């Protein structure tokens, strides 16, 4: 158990001596009965996650508007571990929805854990903090799919740069050789740093990038729109060595015209007279407590995330008529696209025999160091520093390229610590090895298979049915097979000779397609970068759930802003795309009432 410490107050200090009046920060309420009865909210945001707090913060910049955020989990300020980058793993399962998928046929009937954050800030308070903008091809593809050129790379890059505050990390080492400053912003809300952990593995990777530059070239900055090669990792951590999330970067700077109700679930959005005008929210603290309704003067913005948002819409009568009817819900807006198109990334791991020194550390000592100076291993986002982005050659794709374009990788290697590991189930030979370094994980960035979210019943407190349809398309395991072979080539470089032996997971003799498919059937998992369950589409499209202005098709007074509207999982981690979509949505919403 990580020890609790006194909570810090990050509110802005008064500038009264300078003659400047600064508004107090957002007001947090622990129970619905604590909400003030004399406030009419212009906007109600259902979900205080990554996107929801961006929207609330930006809308609150108009002092005339009152904004209410309703979050199912606790405040991040009540959870010490959210502040310490190296303690992210301690947040699960306590502050997680702890979802489980239905059995996946192609994985031998295995059900997979599906982590989603349940606290203020959502996954930005809970995740691995990796900051990737993905490829310019992804954004140009989003623009084409949605019919909105505001999502093209050339249009969205200025949005991302304005929101970013890139700086040196808590070690204050120079950034030269780690990033390209010209593609970063320095005056935004979201703090970003490059990684600087000193480990022997770093030099071997950099030497390999020189030796095998055709497949693994060194890439100075993965966020310039062309993420191909071996690169230094960037993290949403501030220069004080603390996590930067939507809760710390956005919410803490708002005025007291933002009210936040925590530990309360939005159960559905209520329409006026069972029509298509949805401006009221219904919420409760648990299944046995009374349900309360509040009406927004202007709009309701659903920001529950890729799982919760479609569940909220379906419980509100928005979804496929057949699905809703089977769960005893009256259909108010018949849209079978709700909950469909779940796009995620399949992943596996590689472990290998190595004589390199372990990179484990004494967590207790590291925590003392972090509390004292906000430095040391717990101030870092990862124990090693590099990501590798690999684009497979055309002859390995069997004529089908699922990527967004030539600037886009198919595979990501994310390197982890070197440590003694327990053997995976059934792999007894593993115990004969000395140290073992995993690549946790090896990710198929453009997994083609599409899954779905459906209702298990009409109880909003029940978990929905999550079907990833993992390996529903043959190209998906094929790309992971080639990723394993690519990783083996990297680890067989001259730089690694004498330090790294054969892979032990999968076994070194697993080389054929059949052998690797058998391995993948038992080792593949979701990298929980799910998007697309309320996909955005052109205004006139007969498919999709939200229009390019984030309004839910067939309704008024209702928008969705979160990962669920992003049409497909991009070449990278989804945190920054969610921030960018939310920043753009905030501008559109504000302009609607200017």
Swiss-Prot record:
Organism of this sequence: Agaricus bisporus (White button mushroom)
Cofactor info, note text: Binds 1 FAD covalently per subunit.
Gene Ontology cellular component list: extracellular region
PTM: Glycosylated.
Cofactor: FAD
Enzyme class: oxidoreductase
Residues of the signal peptide: 1-25
Noted pH dependence of activity: Optimum pH is 4.5. the enzyme has a second pH optimum at pH 9.
EC number(s) on file: 1.1.99.29
Record protein name field: Pyranose dehydrogenase
Catalytic activity as recorded in UniProt: pyranose + acceptor = pyranos-2-ulose + reduced acceptor; pyranose + acceptor = pyranos-3-ulose + reduced acceptor; pyranose + acceptor = pyranos-2,3-diulose + reduced acceptor; a pyranoside + acceptor = a pyranosid-3-ulose + reduced acceptor
Residues of the active site: 529 (proton acceptor), 573
Primary localization class, coarse: secreted
GO molecular function, one term: flavin adenine dinucleotide binding
């Amino acid at each position: 158990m990580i020890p609790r410490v006194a909570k810090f107050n990050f509110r802005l200090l008064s500038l009264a001596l300078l003659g400047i009046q600064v508004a107090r920060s957002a007001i947090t309420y622990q129970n619905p009965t604590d909400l003030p009865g004399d406030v009419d909210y212009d906007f109600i945001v259902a979900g205080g996650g990554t996107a929801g707090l961006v929207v609330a913060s930006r809308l609150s910049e108009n002092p005339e508007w009152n904004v209410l955020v309703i979050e199912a989990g606790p405040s991040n300020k009540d959870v010490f571990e959210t502040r310490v980058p190296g303690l992210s793993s301690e947040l699960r399962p306590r502050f997680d929805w702890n979802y489980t998928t239905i059995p996946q046929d192609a994985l031998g009937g295995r059900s997979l854990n599906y982590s989603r954050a349940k606290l203020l800030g959502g996954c930005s308070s809970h995740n691995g903090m990796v900051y990737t903008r993905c490829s310019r091809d992804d954004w140009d593809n989003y623009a084409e799919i949605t019919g909105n050129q505001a999502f093209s790379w050339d249009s969205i890059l200025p949005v991302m740069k304005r929101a970013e505050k890139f700086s040196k990390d808590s070690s204050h080492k120079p950034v030269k050789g780690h990033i390209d400053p010209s593609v970063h912003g320095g005056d935004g809300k979201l703090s970003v740093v490059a990684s600087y952990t000193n480990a022997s593995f770093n030099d071997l990777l950099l030497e390999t990038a020189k030796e095998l530059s055709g497949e693994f070239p060194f890439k100075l900055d993965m966020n310039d729109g062309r993420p191909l090669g071996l690169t230094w990792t960037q993290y949403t951590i501030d220069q004080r060595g603390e996590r930067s999330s939507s809760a710390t970067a956005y919410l803490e700077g708002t005025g007291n015209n933002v009210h936040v109700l925590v530990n309360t679930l939005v159960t559905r959005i209520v329409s006026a007279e069972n029509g298509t005008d949805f401006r009221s929210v219904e919420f409760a603290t648990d299944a046995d407590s009374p349900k309360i309704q509040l009406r927004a003067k202007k709009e309701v913005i659903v920001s529950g995330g890729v799982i919760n948002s479609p569940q909220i819409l379906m419980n509100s009568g928005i979804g496929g008529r057949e699905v809703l009817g089977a769960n005893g819900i009256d259909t108010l807006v018949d849209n079978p696209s709700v909950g469909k198109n779940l796009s995620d990334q399949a992943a596996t791991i590689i472990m290998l025999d190595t004589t390199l020194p372990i990179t484990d550390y004494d967590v207790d000592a590291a925590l003392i160091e972090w509390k004292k100076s906000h430095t040391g291993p717990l101030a870092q986002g990862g124990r090693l520093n590099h990501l590798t982005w690999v684009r497979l050659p055309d002859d390995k794709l069997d004529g089908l390229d699922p990527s967004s374009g030539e600037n886009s990788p198919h595979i990501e290697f994310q390197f982890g610590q070197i440590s003694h590991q327990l053997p995976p189930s059934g792999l007894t030979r593993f115990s004969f090895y000395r140290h073992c370094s995993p690549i946790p994980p090896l990710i198929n960035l453009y997994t083609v298979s599409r899954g779905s979210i459906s209702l298990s019943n009409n109880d909003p407190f029940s978990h929905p049915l999550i079907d990833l349809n993992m390996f529903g398309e043959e190209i998906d395991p094929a790309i992971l097979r080639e990723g394993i072979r690519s990783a083996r080539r990297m680890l067989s470089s001259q730089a690694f000779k004498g330090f790294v032996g054969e892979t032990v997971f999968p076994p070194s003799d697993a080389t054929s397609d059949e052998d690797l498919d058998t391995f993948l059937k038992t080792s593949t998992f979701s990298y929980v970068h799910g998007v697309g369950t309320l996909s955005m589409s052109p205004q006139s499209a007969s498919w999709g759930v939200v229009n390019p202005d984030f309004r839910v098709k067939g309704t008024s007074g209702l928008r969705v802003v979160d990962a669920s509207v992003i049409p497909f999982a991009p070449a990278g981690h989804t945190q920054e795309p969610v921030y960018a979509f939310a920043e753009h949505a905030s501008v559109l919403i504000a302009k609607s009432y200017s």
